[in-house]
């Protein structure tokens, strides 16, 4: 079985709606394979929301004008196609726009229902004069890709209901390039640099995660043909490899106090790997193993980048009473008493 080093993925946030992702190292040729697949999926298959039809008070079709409104109905529809919305509802929802002149009508004048958000409230829709009045009913639906107005034309729709071209994709632009990168003595590995720009309705990070999930589901169809088929197996990342090496260390290397060390040895915990498999509750069940011993173990594991099974990843040694992070020592007030340093039981 061929084992490849696990690639890492990093994100460089450029703006609120644009990020650059770097995936490396990839086996030669896989930069283009992965980059092209992700780009296509990001542009065509990320679910989003869009306006599918509108109804303007006093208007029967799009080839007309509204009294007191500078733009004709066709221009208003073109503007509404640029509306950026998100919806948490699977079913169609209705938004309303009511504005009386004079003044500019923007997307911020739209009143969305609960679960629907307008992300570009400053977008221009129309301009009203002193006598202008605009009342619009907008239907928003969820979907993928691009759907032309002719497909949004519902049979039996009421007179005056105007279908609109729907651009569901929340992704504006995706580009990628592949550079060479070095792994040990080899310099022919690929580094994929993916630039993702989205609308404000979704972050680039979430868009990439959605694309990855879609591809995993689709490629899983081929995998199911023979789950035992041989392929390239992704090995651990350098950080994971360091953790694996740490698991084999004897607890002697943690330099624990005698009490903590003896308690763990008596319980049959001989390696770091066996220790991180325990929870705080498991350790507290050990005779003579108290909260101070728990704190000591958590600090020692934190220094290796590890933690107990149920410890939160945000553990901060500086918050442990009596422990000085700078010197790695315990103050008198928070220190272990003498019996913690005296061997309490012969093993």
Curated annotation (Swiss-Prot):
InterPro entries with a match to the protein in the record: DNA-dir_RNA_pol_insert, DNA-dir_RNA_pol_RpoA/D/Rpb3, DNA-dir_RpoA, RBP11-like, RNAP_asu_C, RNApol_insert_sf
Lineage top rank: taxon: Bacteria
Keywords of this entry: DNA-directed RNA polymerase, Nucleotidyltransferase, Transcription, Transferase
Catalytic activity: RNA(n) + a ribonucleoside 5'-triphosphate = RNA(n+1) + diphosphate
SUPFAM superfamilies the record matches: C-terminal domain of RNA polymerase alpha subunit (SSF47789), Insert subdomain of RNA polymerase alpha subunit (SSF56553), RBP11-like subunits of RNA polymerase (SSF55257)
GO molecular function, one term: DNA binding
Keyword Transcription: yes
Gene Ontology cellular component list: cytoplasm; cytosol; DNA-directed RNA polymerase complex; peptidoglycan-based cell wall; plasma membrane
Spans traversing the lipid bilayer: none
EC primary class: transferase
Region Alpha N-terminal domain (alpha-NTD): start-end pairs: 1-226
EC number(s) given by UniProt: 2.7.7.6
Induction: 3-fold repressed by starvation.
Region (Alpha C-terminal domain (alpha-CTD)): 243-347
BP terms from Gene Ontology: DNA-templated transcription
Family affiliation: Belongs to the RNA polymerase alpha chain family.
Domain notes: The N-terminal domain is essential for RNAP assembly and basal transcription, whereas the C-terminal domain is involved in interaction with transcriptional regulators and with upstream promoter elements.
Biological function: DNA-dependent RNA polymerase catalyzes the transcription of DNA into RNA using the four ribonucleoside triphosphates as substrates.
Quaternary structure, from the entry: Homodimer. The RNAP catalytic core consists of 2 alpha, 1 beta, 1 beta' and 1 omega subunit. When a sigma factor is associated with the core the holoenzyme is formed, which can initiate transcription.
Protein's UniProt name: DNA-directed RNA polymerase subunit alpha
Organism: Mycobacterium tuberculosis (strain ATCC 25618 / H37Rv)
